[in-house]
Amino acid sequence: RRQRQMCIRDRLDTDYIDLLLIHQPAGNYIAGYRLMEKAYKEGKVKAIGLSNFTKEGVQEILDICKVKPTVLQTEVHPYDQKKELKEFLAKENIKIQAWYPLGHGDAELMKESAFVIAGTKYKKSTAQVILRWHIQDGNIVIPGSKNADHIKANLDLFDFQLTEEER
C-alpha cells in the first residue's frame, strides 16, 4: 500500500488520480475493479470506470460493484454509434467517452457529405463538425493530436450547433 502511494506521489507527481480505467475485460479484472474501488474509497482516485467493455461486461461489473463506474470509454463515432449500449449506460447513469471520435481518421467519414456541408455552412472543419455531433449526442470526447493547430481547433466547437437534420 505504501509503495502504491509513493508511486502516485513520486512518479505521477500528484496525490490523486482524476479517473482510473480498466483497459479491457481481461485477466482478473473483477479483482482489479475491487482494487480500484478501494483506491476510490481512500480518496486516491476521484472516479473509476471501464474501457472496451460490452454491455454484458458492464452489467457484470454492476452486479458485483460497490462503487458504480462513472464512465465507459469505447469506440464511438458516426459510423459506429453504439445506440443500444448508450441507452443501457444512460439508465445506469454511466457516461460514454468516445474513443476514436473521428473514426480512426477514416477518410470516408471525413468526406461524409452531411459533415462537409455543415462544415461549409458553419465555417468549420469536418473534424470540428463531427466533434460537435458527439457533444450534441451526449458523448464525452477527448480528441488527440500532436498538432497545436488541431488541438486549438478541437476546442473551437461551442459557437455553433447542428440542427436535427444535420445530425
State each model region's role.
Residues 1-7:
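Short, small-residue-biased leader/transition segments that mark boundaries at the very start
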Residues 2, 15, 102-103:
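N-terminal binding-site loop/beta-alpha segment at the start of enzyme catalytic domains
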Residues 8-15:
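Phosphate/pyrophosphate-binding loops at sites that engage ATP/ADP/AMP, CoA/4′-phosphopantetheine
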Residues 19-20:
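Acidic/hydrophobic-patterned starts of short beta strands in beta-sheet-rich repeat architectures
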Residues 24-167:
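Beta/alpha (TIM)-barrel catalytic core signal, keyed to glycine-rich beta->alpha loops juxtaposed to Asp/Glu
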